[in-house]
């Protein structure tokens, strides 16, 4: 006769797991009923701020303290003058774009927060999935659909983090080229173009963050009964 298979935990370990579960359920309840509505309102207000409603993108440009070289010598200049080495002006400290950096300081924590909240929701729902057995699995299918959507949101938020990292890399490359090839004005223009593009990306991120929170609120609240009680059993509160 086959022996029953299961995970055996000591009494203390079982208590610790149960404490974790209860804390998880409380965090999920706090997230749904208080955090989500407040965050949607906050992001909606943030999108009304002047810093995220700049009409003239040229006003975002940061000064580039990169010397512009003298024009090349004339062809009739003496050969000895042509061979004479002129001192190359070296660029000093080149700061980032303060206006873009201030927006990054505002948006980046919001991106991290949504990613962590997605992980919270995923963990919460996973702990609500019942034992796999024959019977009515309609509620479980709903849980899986919600998990699928939350994971999709998390993936998009992770792409935001990549976009933020790429901004520094791409702008740094443009500044390096502008400081090395000081006679090429297009490299200077490239720096400004990258800053303007970053502003548009950051505003779009805030719009998406608000939309993602609204979507999470809608999909969870609309399916809450099946999420917390997939088998239709009597269970108190959200757990």
From Swiss-Prot:
Q: Which residues carry this modification: Phosphoserine?
A: 10
UniProt induction comment: By IFNG/IFN-gamma.
A GO cellular component annotation in the UniProt record: cytosol
InterPro entries per the record? PA28_C, PA28_C_sf, PA28_N_sf, Proteasome_activ_PA28, Proteasome_activ_PA28_N, Proteasome_activ_sf
Tell me where on the tree of life, at the top rank, the source sits.
Answer: Eukaryota
Give the disulfide map: none
Q: Which UniProt keywords apply?
A: Acetylation, Phosphoprotein, Proteasome
Q: Which Gene3D superfamilies match?
A: Proteasome activator pa28, C-terminal domain (1.20.120.180), Proteasome activator pa28, N-terminal domain (1.20.5.120)
**MF annotations from Gene Ontology:** endopeptidase activator activity; identical protein binding
Which residues are recorded with the post-translational modification N-acetylalanine? 2
- What biological-process GO terms show up in the record? regulation of G1/S transition of mitotic cell cycle; regulation of proteasomal protein catabolic process
Question: Which purpose does this protein serve, as stated in its record?
Answer: Implicated in immunoproteasome assembly and required for efficient antigen processing. The PA28 activator complex enhances the generation of class I binding peptides by altering the cleavage pattern of the proteasome.
Q: Partners and quaternary state?
A: Heterodimer of PSME1 and PSME2, which forms a hexameric ring.
The family assignment reads: Belongs to the PA28 family.
Q: List the protein's name.
A: Proteasome activator complex subunit 2
**What is the native source organism of this protein?**
Homo sapiens (Human)
Q: Which gene encodes it?
A: PSME2
């Amino acid at each position: 006769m086959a022996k029953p298979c299961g995970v055996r935990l000591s009494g203390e370990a079982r208590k610790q797991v149960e404490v974790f579960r209860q804390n998880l359920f409380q965090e999920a309840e706090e997230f749904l009923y208080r955090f989500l509505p407040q965050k949607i309102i906050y992001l909606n207000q943030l999108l009304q701020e002047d810093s995220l409603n700049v009409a003239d993108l040229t006003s975002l440009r940061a000064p580039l303290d990169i010397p512009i070289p003298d024009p090349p010598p004339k062809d009739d200049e003496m050969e000895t003058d042509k061979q004479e080495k002129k001192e190359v002006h070296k660029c000093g400290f080149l700061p980032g774009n303060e206006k873009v950096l201030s927006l990054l300081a505002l948006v980046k924590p919001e991106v991290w927060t949504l990613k962590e909240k997605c992980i919270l929701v995923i963990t919460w729902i996973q702990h609500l999935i019942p034992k796999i057995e024959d019977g009515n699995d309609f509620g479980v299918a709903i849980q899986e659909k919600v998990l699928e959507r939350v994971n999709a949101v998390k993936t998009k938020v992770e792409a935001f983090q990549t976009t933020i990292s790429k901004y520094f890399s791409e702008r740094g490359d443009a500044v390096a080229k502008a400081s090395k090839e000081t006679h090429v004005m297009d490299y200077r223009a490239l720096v400004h173009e990258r800053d303007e593009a970053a502003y548009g990306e950051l505003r779009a991120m805030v719009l998406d963050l608000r939309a993602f929170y609204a979507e999470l609120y809608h999909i969870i609240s609309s399916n809450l009964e099946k999420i917390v009680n997939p088998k239709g059993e009597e269970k108190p509160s959200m757990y």
